[in-house]
Amino acid sequence: MNSQHHFIGLSEQQVADSRAKYGINVLTPPPTTPLWKQFLEKFRDPLIIILLIAGVLSVAISIYEYIGLHQGAEVFFEPVGIFVAIFLATGLSFYFETQADKEFCVLNQVNDDESVEVIRSGNHTQIAKRDVVVGDIVRIGIGCEIPADGELLVATQLSVDESTLTGEPLCHKTTDPALFDLKATYPSNRVLRGTKVMEGHALMQVTAVGDATENGKVYKAAQIDNSVKTPLSEQLDWLGLWVSRLSCSIGVAVVVARIVMYLAQYDFCFANVDTLAFIAYILQTLMIAMTLVVVSVPEGLPMAVTLSLAYSMRRMLKTNNLVRKMHACETMGATTVICTDKTGTLTQNRMSVEEACFYRGGEDCKSIVDANKILLDSSDFSNEIKEGIAVNSTASLDLSNPAAPSVLGNPTEGALLLWLHAKGVDYEALREEVKVVEELPFTTDRKYMATVVESALMPGKRMLYVKGAPEIVYDLCASTDGVPLKAAVDAQLKLYQQRAMRTLGFACQEIGDEKVIVDGTIHVDKLRFLGITAIADPVRNEVPESIGECLNAGICVKIVTGDTAETAKEIGRQVGLWTDKDTDRNIISGPEFAALTDAQLDALVMDIKIIARARPMDKKRLVEALQRKNQVVAVTGDGTNDAPALKAAHVGLSMGDGTSVAKEASDITIIDNSFKSICKAVMWGRSLYLNIQRFLLFQLTVNVTACMLVLCGALMGTEAPLTVTQMLWINLIMDTFAAMALASLPPSEAVMNDRPRDRRAFIINRPMLAEIVGVGGFFFALLVALLYIFEHADIQQLTDIVRVQIGENSTVTPYELTLLFTIFVMTHFFYLFNARAFATHRSALHLKGCKGLVFISTLIFVTQVCMVELPGVQRFFNVVSLKPLDWLIIIVGSSFVLWMRELWSLLRNKK
């Protein structure tokens, strides 16, 4: 792989020319359904169809009243109002769904912004995938997604998963024509956009970008996966069906009750019934019943969920959480266990060589000062260390800013290159001058890597360089000449690991022409151990607080790391996970973990805090064991080998700098790799669930009131207490507007003080049910009492109720019906604020960050006043103007809903 440095790559001018000629590396999305078709799709909704039927019935009744009864043109205001309500409901629903679609499309954009390592003007640098052009030289390594079509220049044991294009899960790629697979779909030296590197590394020269790639010719846009039915979505489907059936039953009851009441006026003597009037009455009754069904059915629930998800996904992206699968938003809020990597997630992933211990002919070098001296001399021992670090590596440095070089590739290997660079050793020159004979890439199972080269610093020598986990590398060594006994090396390692430093061991051997790398292992008999470097990776400043927040929220955190037990324990101690009370039962090594039977693991799994020296499949087995304990598991991963665990977990969390294979297997990508962002994802998941509960609380409370009021009105034999257009306005408030207001509520950090919810628990819990029945019942009793008073007394202004005298039945006047309608709306207007404060200890008037709620509530209030007071609007809703005193009494009286809740909350908080 070292021969890569003979390539210069494109200049800036050549990049511009190539982009102008061949275009950018972005796939054109497939054509979408035209907006007008998407809008018309809304009219296929069963509830909209019911409303359209109600509108047609209203038109028929209005025509009868206008022609048959010679009434004025104002009879057409109601059908016009119905159709306006229909278009308003469909229009708002269409608008917010298109907005949500735009939010979900962010996945494609982020995918195009992923970093790619290229060589330009002789320098290694990182660019966005969208900026790759034809002619670019791109470095590809294990786990990465190939950014464009290209031809291999150099390849080391390269295997590519082409299943997305050819169905072949593993294709071996090479630049050696003698090894070409002549039966392969594509030439063995050609790699294709969208396929993934499963093993090895290579350099490729781009030959096609964007739509010109093979992938571009069969491209289907990546989408947010919303196909998974979560417990919440299943509950909401069942709830919607149950409410729909109940609403239809109430609708039938209203029809029967109104017909019976109508015929009772004529002692059920059909001869006395005016047929046309009776038909008109039945049509009106059917219209009221259908409207009641529309009002009762929670058709706003899907929109509330969609809006909540879209809003949450957009805001989560701002906190470095890219949601790839929609169900993960909800599931993250129910997480009970987080299995996390150490490097980069708990630590800063800013590695630097802090200590070194090299062994030269019995001379111990146990300080970084001594190690620096060795690097600067010209002995063979020094040359072995310098050359071994420089050539036995897949990392590079971006030296475009010499004052602040940055690492490209593995951060641990990069720390070694930075160490050489800081001491004036030109690692690039060393790579240029050697001839690489063969390589053995690093794997998590092997835990070491090896490279055979024709040495540049020691001419005439062929050298094998090995680097990896010190204990593994030491055990490979046959020569102990000048090297302390293993016990002494282990003691040195333990000192480093107790300081939470990552260690690497080095070895080398001069060899002949024989092949020493066979079947993925090295076969030598005189490998000599050179020494150890200790690399520091400080804990992220915010992690201890975030770990504490998770523990306080009832979430267990488990560290799964490839580091040693001592290193892992020290990191655990620094982040607040490992305490003095913990014992050997709380930590286990990868081999010990693998040796456990399932029964033994099930008995131990909840106590395990750290798995050290973990192997890839250990993480997946840990996830499965936790799931057997009914835990909701989130797991982090950044490598290709993490994909099985990411898929097995309830929520897979890939890292922003992880491989494409890991990202594709995950549900959420943590862009900044930080554990704090994982903690934020939990908070967003819990808040999303709470917002949906708030919407249900508000809507079902309004449902109970509206349904019972209309049914009771029918049984009392009165005129319908609410007209069709009034019910549609109420429906608009509690469905569309409430969905908009409550779905956009910001997350509350207070949710992190609660224990995780039971993922299978029904979303309507006991406190919600009690409030729905209690508040809905209170509103119903209040409105029925008012309806009874209006039916048996002549109310000229609202203050008359204080001294009212109940008399015989009388017709409810338009003024009284307007009072009833306005009181209904205003009580629920104030209850909207109560719903916002549900399950919190905050005041309902704590509106910081609730811009959407404030805007929507203001809109509801202003619109209600306008429809009652503006002459042009009154006719649509069959209302009349109210007196200023009436408004004052209604507003003050209705607000008692709010103040009673505030008083109760105050008393509860004091207790």
Q: Residue ranges of each PLM-predicted region?
A:
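Alpha-helix capping/termination and helix-coil
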Residues: N630, V682, R686, A781-A793, ...
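Membrane-water interface at loop-to-transmembrane-helix junctions
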Residues: R759-G777, G807-L819
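Conserved cytosolic headpiece of P-type ATPases
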Residues: M1-P756, A761-I764, F821, F838-K911
